């Protein structure tokens, strides 16, 4: 008889424990239901990239002194810099400059260490093509300024989702309070 009462007591404790776990899961679900969706309908809606976003590299041919610092600091020696030495002015003359974005890891070292600031990162991230050879940009393609997301009239810009609301990185803080209450 005593073992039967003890069994019912264990069963009751397990039932209460299961109800706690179900309540915790339900509170997490309710917490997520109150949040705004994080996805956008991509071709028609776009998020504005942050100021530190590392997009396609922009190159200014006139500022480049062909020092090749960008090649030396690149982890994969990616930029191809061709130059000729002009004897009459005793300087290097840049003849061509290219970057293959199919290989580039967008680390930004070339931009950071360029002594003349002829390289900069843009907010352009739409680089997909059907042919990988089209990702090899020469100085003409690199010099083209991208159309800003804000200036494009064919899409709806969503600026409210560029930064997460305060407290979203805390995880399920509301559900933790509920679980502490249930304990």
From Swiss-Prot:
Its EC number is 7.1.1.-. [4Fe-4S] cluster 2 binds at residues 74, 104, 107, 110. One of its GO terms (biological process) is photosynthesis, light reaction. GO terms for molecular function: 4 iron, 4 sulfur cluster binding; iron ion binding; NADH dehydrogenase (ubiquinone) activity; quinone binding. It catalyses: a plastoquinone + NADH + (n+1) H(+)(in) = a plastoquinol + NAD(+) + n H(+)(out); a plastoquinone + NADPH + (n+1) H(+)(in) = a plastoquinol + NADP(+) + n H(+)(out). It is a peripheral membrane protein. It is found in: Plastid, Chloroplast thylakoid membrane. Belongs to the complex I 23 kDa subunit family. This is NAD(P)H-quinone oxidoreductase subunit I, chloroplastic.
């Amino acid at each position: 008889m005593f073992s039967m009462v003890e069994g019912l007591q264990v069963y009751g404790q397990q039932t209460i424990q299961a109800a706690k776990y179900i309540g915790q899961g339900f509170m997490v679900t309710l917490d997520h239901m109150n949040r705004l969706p994080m996805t956008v309908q991509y071709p028609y809606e776009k998020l504005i990239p942050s100021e530190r976003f590392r997009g396609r590299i922009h190159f200014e041919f006139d500022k480049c002194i062909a020092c090749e610092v960008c090649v030396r600091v690149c982890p994969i020696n990616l930029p191809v810099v061709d130059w000729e030495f002009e004897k009459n002015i005793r300087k290097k003359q840049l003849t061509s400059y290219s970057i293959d974005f199919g290989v580039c890891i967008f680390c930004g070292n070339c931009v950071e260490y360029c002594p003349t600031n002829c390289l900069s990162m843009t907010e352009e991230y739409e680089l997909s093509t059907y042919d990988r050879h089209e990702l090899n940009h020469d100085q003409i393609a690199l010099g083209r300024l991208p159309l800003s997301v804000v200036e494009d009239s064919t899409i709806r810009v969503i600026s409210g989702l560029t930064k997460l609301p305060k407290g979203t990185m805390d995880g399920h803080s509301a559900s933790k309070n509920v679980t502490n209450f249930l304990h």
